[in-house]
Amino acid sequence: MVDEAKLNLIEIVLRAYDPUYSCAAHMIVKDEQGKVLLEVKKEE
C-alpha cells in the first residue's frame, strides 16, 4: 500500500530542490527494489 502522506512529502521536497519538477511532463517513483510505484503523465 502506498502512503499518500509520504508521497506528498516527497513531492514537496522534490519541488523545493528542483523547480522544474513541478512542470515535469513525466514522473516515475520507484521503491528500493526498483519497482515502479507511481507513474504520472501530465496531460497537455
From Swiss-Prot:
Domain of life of the source: Archaea
GO molecular function: metal ion binding; oxidoreductase activity
EC number, as in UniProt: 1.12.99.-
Binding site for Ni(2+): U20, C23
Gene3D superfamilies: Cytochrome-c3 Hydrogenase, chain B
Cofactors: Ni(2+)
Keywords in alphabetical order: Metal-binding, Nickel, Oxidoreductase, Selenocysteine
Propeptide: 26-44
UniProt similarity note: Belongs to the [NiFe]/[NiFeSe] hydrogenase large subunit family.
Note: The large subunit of Vhu is split into VhuA and VhuU. Each contributes two ligands to the [NiFeSe] center.
Assembly information from the UniProt record: The F420-non-reducing hydrogenase vhu is composed of four subunits; VhuA, VhuD, VhuG and VhuU.
Record-given protein name: F420-non-reducing hydrogenase vhu subunit U
Organism: Methanococcus maripaludis (strain DSM 14266 / JCM 13030 / NBRC 101832 / S2 / LL)
Upper lineage: Archaea, Methanobacteriati, Methanobacteriota, Methanomada group, Methanococci
